[in-house]
């Protein structure tokens, strides 16, 4: 599976992911995603994505 992160906010965001079922993590610390940027990557099944939006 492929997952795409797109930042449509006016500010930089730091997505973080946590995989389940003993699968390798996509990132250990999250990653920077600047405003207007998209990135794609492989996502193992049962990937949880949690978004926290604050101003």
Swiss-Prot record:
Chief location bin: secreted
Taken from the UniProt entry, a GO cellular component term is: extracellular region
Q: Which organism is it from?
A: Senna didymobotrya (Popcorn cassia)
Full protein name: Thaumatin-like protein
Q: Where in the cell is it found?
A: Secreted
Family of the protein in this entry? Belongs to the thaumatin family.
Q: By its UniProt entry, which PROSITE patterns does this protein fall under?
A: THAUMATIN_2 (PS51367)
Question: Which keywords belong to this entry?
Answer: Antimicrobial, Disulfide bond, Fungicide, Secreted
Give the induction annotation. Answer: By salicylic acid and by laminarin oligosaccharides.
Could you state one GO biological process linked to this protein?
A: defense response to fungus
Chain's role: Has antifungal activity against C.albicans 586 (EC(50)=6.2 uM), C.parapsilosis ATCC 22019 (EC(50)=2.2 uM), C.krusei ATCC 14243 (EC(50)=2.5 uM) and C.krusei 80 (EC(50)=5.4 uM). Has no activity against C.neoformans, C.tropicalis or T.glabrata.
